[in-house]
Amino acid sequence: MPLTYHTLKHYLPHRYPFLLVDKIVACTPGECITGIKNVTINEEFFNGHFPDEPIMPGVLMVECMAQVSGVLGFISAGLTAEDGYLYLFAGVDKVRFKRRVIPGDQLIIRSKIVMQKQGIYKFDCTVHVEDELAVSAQIMIARQEQ
């Protein structure tokens, strides 16, 4: 059930340069999701972070996890952004950075629902590069009408 840009735009309001998910490769509604982000030297953030040794900012890896989690929230609720809703960050806990992410890396972003109540979700999330853990966090999002 791959979801590419043309389908993702129905779930996420983000657009270039802030859409940080290239595709969804697996999803079990109400349970878990896996997304992909291909990191290239052409990313805007590499202009300043850092020009001589480009490293993806950790906060953007957290945003990748939040965006993938938002897609899972929409799919689990049977909604799209076109239904007049957004999923917004409500919290982030237990963030741990384990590995630098550099141009050429492919991020495998996994999110698993650990709690859901009235449009509020908590997820356990990880980002891997190949088999190596790059970052982990608990992400909380909340559904809001636009």
From Swiss-Prot:
Q: Which GO terms describe its cellular component?
A: cytoplasm; membrane
Determine if Aminoacyl-tRNA synthetase is one of this entry's keywords: no
Q: Which reaction does it catalyse?
A: a (3R)-hydroxyacyl-[ACP] = a (2E)-enoyl-[ACP] + H2O
One Pfam family of this chain: FabA
Q: Which UniProt keywords apply?
A: Cytoplasm, Lipid A biosynthesis, Lipid biosynthesis, Lipid metabolism, Lyase
Q: Where in the cell is it found?
A: Cytoplasm
Q: What class of enzyme is it?
A: lyase
Q: Does the keyword Lipid biosynthesis apply?
A: yes
What SUPFAM superfamilies does the entry give?
A: Thioesterase/thiol ester dehydrase-isomerase
Q: Which processes are annotated in GO (biological process)? A: fatty acid biosynthetic process; lipid A biosynthetic process
Q: Please give the superkingdom of this protein's source.
A: Bacteria
GO function term, MF aspect, one:
(3R)-hydroxyacyl-[acyl-carrier-protein] dehydratase activity
Active site (record annotation):
49
- The catalytic activity of this protein is classed by the Enzyme Commission as 4.2.1.59
What family is this? Belongs to the thioester dehydratase family. FabZ subfamily.
- Entry-linked PANTHER family: 3-HYDROXYACYL-[ACYL-CARRIER-PROTEIN] DEHYDRATASE
Function of the protein: Involved in unsaturated fatty acids biosynthesis. Catalyzes the dehydration of short chain beta-hydroxyacyl-ACPs and long chain saturated and unsaturated beta-hydroxyacyl-ACPs.
Q: What is this protein called?
A: 3-hydroxyacyl-[acyl-carrier-protein] dehydratase FabZ
Q: Which organism is it from?
A: Psychrobacter arcticus (strain DSM 17307 / VKM B-2377 / 273-4)
Q: What's the gene?
A: fabZ
